[in-house]
């Protein structure tokens, strides 16, 4: 990890799992880190643990903002609070995700909660924070990055020939990704389609920066199989692995 003194980072879903440890590593490298979380109690407990287990962190180096990626209103409010606190953003990591369940749960954006959390909120937050990312990119020796935490799930749930339908904003895979069926496999397909959308956004955003000559790197990464207690469901994982892709 390079020295990140003077850099500002934002990590969504930073109170647990991959997000938690991402916040810690960035802060230990010297960055000032903000993370988004839905629950105040869990966020405050996470901050307390970070400082307790890493006594070298400076006061005010780790901060949290109430951001629920399943709510567009919450995403926009969180961006407003972040802009009120900082003038630039060097590192934006979209880590928060929805696992694909609750097929009938619609977000305030009018789309199913999985697509809202894993794609639309990512798009909205990135656009809202564009000026701050570009401010950081204009600095000498800038190394601005947008990292989208994705998944290899699409390769497990869909064939190479399958194509999502993103053509109709009022239906298809934007509003109801991969249909409205319930159950574990349907949830995995829903999750996969939302991650496909995230990957397409990643590629398009990088292409636009390149055309403009803006020195910002945008990447999607698959962290691999990571133990995270709320996700562990041995019976359903075994069921998924028995299914042909």
UniProtKB/Swiss-Prot annotation:
Record-linked InterPro entries: NAD(P)-bd_dom_sf (IPR036291), Sc_DH/Rdtase_CS (IPR020904), SDR_fam (IPR002347)
UniProt family annotation: Belongs to the short-chain dehydrogenases/reductases (SDR) family.
Protein's name according to its UniProt entry: Short-chain dehydrogenase/reductase pyiH
PANTHER family cross-referenced by the UniProt entry: RETINOL DEHYDROGENASE (PTHR24320), WW DOMAIN-CONTAINING OXIDOREDUCTASE (PTHR24320:SF282)
Species assigned in the record: Pyricularia grisea (Crabgrass-specific blast fungus)
EC number, UniProt record: 1.1.1.-
Gene knockout outcome: Leads to the loss of pyrichalasin H production, but accumulates novel cytochalasans.
Function in brief: Short-chain dehydrogenase/reductase; part of the gene cluster that mediates the biosynthesis of the mycotoxin pyrichalasin H, a tyrosine-derived cytochalasan that inhibits the growth of rice seedlings, but also inhibits lymphocyte capping and actin polymerization and alters cell morphology. Pyrichalasin H is indicated as the responsible agent for the genus-specific pathogenicity of M.grisea toward crabgrass. The first step in the pathway is catalyzed by the O-methyltransferase pyiA which methylates free tyrosine to generate the precursor O-methyltyrosine.
PROSITE patterns: ADH_SHORT (PS00061)
Pfam family, one: adh_short
Alphabetical UniProt keywords: NADP, Oxidoreductase
Pathway: Mycotoxin biosynthesis
Top-rank EC class of the record's enzyme: oxidoreductase
GO molecular function, one term: oxidoreductase activity
Superkingdom to which the source organism belongs: Eukaryota
Active site: 150
Binding site for NADP(+): 18, 42, 68, 95
């Amino acid at each position: 990890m390079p020295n990140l003194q003077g850099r500002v980072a934002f990590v969504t879903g930073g109170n647990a799992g991959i997000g938690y440890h991402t916040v810690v590593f960035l802060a230990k490298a010297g960055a000032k880190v903000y993370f988004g979380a839905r629950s105040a109690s869990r966020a405050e407990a996470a901050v307390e643990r970070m400082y307790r287990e890493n006594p070298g962190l400076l006061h005010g180096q780790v901060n949290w903002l109430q951001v629920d990626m399943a709510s567009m209103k919450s995403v926009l409010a969180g961006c407003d609070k972040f802009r009120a606190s900082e003038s630039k953003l060097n590192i934006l990591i979209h880590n928060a995700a929805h696992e694909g369940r609750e097929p009938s749960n619609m977000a305030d954006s009018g789309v199913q909660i999985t697509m809202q959390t894993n794609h639309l909120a990512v798009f909205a937050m990135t656009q809202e924070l564009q000026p701050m990312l570009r401010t950081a990119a204009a600095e000498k020796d800038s190394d601005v990055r947008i990292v989208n935490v994705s998944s290899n799930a699409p390769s497990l749930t869909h064939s190479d020939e399958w194509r999502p339908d993103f053509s109709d904003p009022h239906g298809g895979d934007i509003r109801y990704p991969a249909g409205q069926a319930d159950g574990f496999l349907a949830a995995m397909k829903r999750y996969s389609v939302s991650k496909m959308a995230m990957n397409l956004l990643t590629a398009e955003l990088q292409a636009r920066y390149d055309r403009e000559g803006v020195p910002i790197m945008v990447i999607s990464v698959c962290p691999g199989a990571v133990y995270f207690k709320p996700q562990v469901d041995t019976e359903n994982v075994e069921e998924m692995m028995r299914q042909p892709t």
